[in-house]
Swiss-Prot record:
Record's protein name: Probable aquaporin TIP2-1
Keywords: Membrane, Repeat, Transmembrane, Transmembrane helix, Transport, Vacuole
Membrane association type: Multi-pass membrane protein
Organism: Oryza sativa subsp. japonica (Rice)
Record-level GO cellular component terms: plant-type vacuole membrane
Domain text: Aquaporins contain two tandem repeats each containing three membrane-spanning domains and a pore-forming loop with the signature motif Asn-Pro-Ala (NPA).
PROSITE patterns registered for this protein in UniProt: MIP
GO biological process: water transport
Record function comment: Aquaporins facilitate the transport of water and small neutral solutes across cell membranes. May be involved in transport from the vacuolar compartment to the cytoplasm.
Length: 248
């Protein structure tokens, strides 16, 4: 059962919430800068060569490490979402209000966009790689993104949002980084392995190319929402909203 709550302006503009937005902006910027930067660096080292297995592994590791750090540094302030699909999945489960979630989205999208614009500047105008499907249709890309984003948000629920997580919560950032790295290895050659609308939106802004960008909104949001429904209803059970300061 969907547990969406709209929220109030008072809560969404409280000092705690504003700090959370700033934390999401900074952490998303750092994550996207390292993630997209690793792809640009690969292109520089190979003179624009096609992605090979070693390059895929390197980029997956860079994303995993950057997300591990990004979630860690923001976790105590904002919950460490860094991803509109994670925010949406948590909203579906009643862990963040719609209004506060929208401001999370704005912070995440701004952070990702500025990260990519900075990369374009510091690399002397090098092309910013954007996500796009390869060897599959856009519909197949959507399904791929649904599956891998479901895995990501399910992991977030199991290690960070579940009230019974106990000491498991201490490994949440590394578990989240691991699932993202693994999913990039699996989906990178096909859909790009985004799992994150902000991670795809930032490069699209910097490159001025939004072709196929809808895939990386539709797929991740469906996958994240499904994970929120499944874990929230089947495993967490009764609706017990978490206080705003914990996840918002």
């Amino acid at each position: 059962m969907v547990k969406l709550a709209f929220g109030s302006l008072g809560d969404s503009f409280s000092a705690t919430s504003v700090k959370a937005y700033v934390a999401e902006f900074i952490a998303t910027l750092l994550f996207v800068f390292a993630g997209v930067g690793s792809a640009i660096a690969y292109g520089q080292l190979t003179n624009g060569g096609a992605l090979d297995p070693a390059g895929l592994v390197a980029i997956a590791i860079a994303h995993a490490l950057a997300l591990f750090v990004g979630v860690s540094v923001a976790a105590n302030i904002s919950g460490g979402h860094l991803n509109p699909a994670v925010t949406f999945g948590l909203a579906v489960g009643g862990h963040i209000t719609i209004l506060t979630g929208l401001f999370y989205w704005i912070a995440q999208l701004l952070g990702a966009s500025i990260a990519c614009l900075l990369l374009k500047f510091v690399t002397h105008g090098k092309a910013i790689p954007t996500h796009g499907v390869a060897g599959i249709s856009e519909l197949e890309g959507v399904v791929m993104e649904i599956v891998i984003t479901f895995a990501l948000v399910y992991t977030v629920y199991a290690t960070a949002a579940d009230p019974k997580k106990g000491s498991l919560g201490t490994i949440a950032p590394i578990a989240i980084g691991f699932i993202v790295g693994a999913n990039i290895l699996a989906a990178g050659p096909f859909s790009g392995g985004s799992m994150n609308p902000a991670r795809s939106f930032g490069p699209a802004v910097a490159a001025g190319n939004f072709a196929g960008n809808w895939v990386y909104w539709v797929g991740p949001l469906i996958g994240g929402g499904l994970a929120g429904l499944v874990y929230g209803d089947v495993f967490i059970g009764s609706y017990q909203p978490v206080a705003d300061q914990d996840y918002a």
